[in-house]
């Protein structure tokens, strides 16, 4: 009995490419998958992450095998965690016969916060990205990116005004290359402590009074926030390299204020 699968199907991807040009990254982008992430309190958060998965393609291959990325992500019906991140990446590089690989996993992470006066609790969400890379020679590198919403209040506005000062919500983003485990909560707490005031999911009137006055008593330019955060990141031994950036969504302008500091401690060592 003849079957369509009885005859060999050509593997076009494995055929030789005459242009002889290597590709740095090729793969799949924006695929969602359930993940689990351990929190600092000993619990596990179940969430959904957006994945980008790439490998380097040698100059002599026409294409990569796109279906294998999906197979790796879904293998054993497992949920991806930070603990399984490196093994998954190494499996991807091996199965696709590549020397380099890159996986990004972006997901919402929730922290239960208590309001500063009433103590009422509510969830705050933070955008987190885990990035793993396999470099030539097999070296693994892990980077964590956390976007932290905060409040900033303008020192100049406070100084020149008879009363009040303009303030706004800001996003402070820390991207850190790690040499050891660092909790998401630690990064959030570090950033929030350097803002004019924290942002909360739920506030009662006494809390609203507190955060308004707290921001007024603690004005920060966008430059101040990135410098203050960078000063603490410089002391964190679990971080090899970092970028800290702040975008202030100005309340009196139709544009944002922005600042960025980057440092690689490994180069300076």
UniProtKB/Swiss-Prot annotation:
Signal peptide positions on this chain: none
Classification via Gene3D superfamilies: Urate Oxidase (3.10.270.10)
Alphabetical list of Pfam families matching this protein: GCHY-1
Species of origin: Azoarcus sp. (strain BH72)
Any one of the GO BP annotations: tetrahydrofolate biosynthetic process
Keywords tagged on the record: Hydrolase
Protein name: GTP cyclohydrolase FolE2
Catalytic function, reaction form: GTP + H2O = 7,8-dihydroneopterin 3'-triphosphate + formate + H(+)
Gene Ontology MF terms: GTP cyclohydrolase I activity
